[in-house]
């Protein structure tokens, strides 16, 4: 995905890497061997540990960073879960501003999505799960209703598992693997998150030059 966008922008000398680290100590050891500018997508547990380690300012309501860059020695980070979810919803024809989200889960992904959804003017129905969402800037958007436009279960069991059936016009999932089609919501959201990271971190000065989400998904399907 990074290679597709970088080639679209005319950038060269791009190399894909995979860095596995289950602790900050492992991250520090592996990152120390890498030279040049770096862009990493972070997952659990690193996305919760990296802000303090790199001394990055983050939203205390979300408390995680899933995209980090090191450019000319300067580290920056952002959480793109919320903005990526909104962009993916718009791609499938749902406008968050005028829609109601039924949300189950209380982890950082759920909080990021709730924050972005509320900030965009949408309404939220909370579904009871294993982990309840904390109080936050999304409180003003929470309503008591049975009618939801879109639903997502972010509270599946450890190691994955089936989502519960939720009452909404459409229910989406952000779980995917190498066999997931590129027209599935999970892949659409990942691609949207990637573009948001380009806008926020890697090339904010070239926002207008970035490919559209539709074009990126088309290129991903071709190169699969």
Residue ranges and their predicted role:
Residues 1-92, 178:
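Phosphate/diphosphate ligand-binding glycine-rich loop within oxidoreductases
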Residues 17-27, 128-147:
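A short, well-structured beta->alpha microelement
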Residues 20-22, 42-45, 105-107, 127-130, ...:
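Structural motif
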Residues 70-71, 122, 166-170:
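A short helix->loop->beta-strand "cap" motif at the edges of active sites that frequently abuts
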Residues 79-82, 89-122, 126-130:
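Glycine-rich adenosine-cofactor-binding loop
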Residues 136-191:
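Rossmann-like adenosine-cofactor binding region
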Residues 170-224:
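Adenosine-phosphate binding glycine-rich loop
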């Amino acid at each position: 995905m990074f290679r597709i966008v970088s080639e679209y922008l005319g950038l060269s000398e791009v190399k894909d890497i995979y860095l596995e680290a289950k602790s900050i100590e492992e991250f520090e050891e592996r990152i120390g061997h890498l030279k040049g500018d770096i862009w990493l997508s972070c997952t659990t547990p690193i996305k919760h540990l990296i802000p303090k380690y790199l001394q990055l300012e983050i939203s205390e309501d979300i408390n995680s960073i899933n995209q980090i860059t090191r450019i000319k020695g300067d580290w920056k980070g952002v959480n793109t879960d919320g903005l990526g979810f909104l962009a993916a919803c718009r791609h499938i024809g749902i406008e968050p501003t005028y829609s109601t989200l039924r949300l189950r889960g209380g982890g950082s992904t759920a909080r990021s999505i709730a924050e972005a959804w509320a900030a965009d003017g949408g309404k939220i129905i909370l579904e009871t799960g294993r982990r309840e969402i904390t109080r936050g800037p999304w409180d003003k958007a929470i309503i008591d209703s049975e009618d939801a436009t879109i639903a997502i279960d972010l509270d599946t069991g450890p190691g994955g598992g089936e989502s519960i059936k939720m009452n909404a016009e459409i229910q989406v999932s952000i779980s995917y693997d190498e066999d997931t089609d590129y027209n599935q919501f999970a892949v659409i959201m990942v691609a949207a998150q990637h573009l948001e990271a380009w806008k926020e971190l890697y090339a904010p000065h070239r926002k207008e030059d970035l490919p559209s989400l539709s074009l990126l998904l088309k290129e991903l399907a071709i190169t699969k």
